Amino acid sequence: MNEYSLTPVQEVDGLHIKRDDLYAPFGPGEVNGGKLRQCVMLVNSVKKDYKSLLTYCSIHSPQAPITAAVARANGMPCRIVYGGTTRESVAALPMPRLAMKYGASIVLAARSGRHSILQARAKELAAQENSFIVQYGINIIGYGDTLLTAVAAQTENLPDDIENLVMTCGSGITATGVMIGLHRYGKRVKRMHLVATAPDRRGFIHETLKKYGADREFEYHDLFHSPGFVYEKSAAATWGGIRLHPHYEAKTMQWFRGSGIAPESTLFWITGAEPRSPGQS
């Protein structure tokens, strides 16, 4: 399977599931899914102009190992910029450990892990070594066509008529790409449910959809601001034996199970699965 292959839609215990987690070019248990595909296509489009890759993110984000794996596949050095953490935490946590397994070096660049502070440090570091910066959610500014087209193409094999489409919304890039694809391939989705595990991206989503002539209504379910929600806290959920990502789809599945929406009328979009960390069986 390459980055242009369609991942399957499976019917599991009455629920249609888009299995984008099955895009796993580096093998079972490794980094996978739609965000990996976006990173692969992004780096393919820029690698001739840069010597190395660099990303900055939360120590819990799969963006670090995804970037590291793509860098290794292209023979490029990779640096991961973290803030507000320690060497001990980096050595113990699964995402930094996996990034290091793929050959990335870790830079503890700031006392704070705030996005704006890490972004400024990343720009300084990138300028020193002609590094391309892979940004939060995978770069949308300047590379929108590449990324959104990669996502939109995956809607081609969805059923033509869907009553409810349920998916996680973080940066909003995948959700936006899906809705562009629904428009492009004439898929009729009655209710689009975005379950948010990050700050509100509705403005960005509508603005981007308008540029592609694909703006539409969607229902926005805000988990991020709900009482007790913590991004870093894992959730556990499975469906028909499919183990869902503890930071993303597992939380969306917990919401779905309590929503009253019938599985038989729903397509559930899985963007990716949690990769195994080093030492994990």
Residue ranges, per PLM feature:
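Gly/Ser/Thr-rich loops at beta-strand to alpha-helix junctions
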Residues: 57-65, 87-88, 167-177, 248-252, ...
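A glycine-rich helix N-cap at a beta->alpha junction
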Residues: 76-120, 213-214
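A short, small-residue-rich loop immediately preceding and capping a beta-strand
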Residues: 49-68, 74-83, 164-171
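Glycine-rich phosphate/pyrophosphate-binding loop at beta-loop-alpha junctions
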Residues: 144-219, 274-281
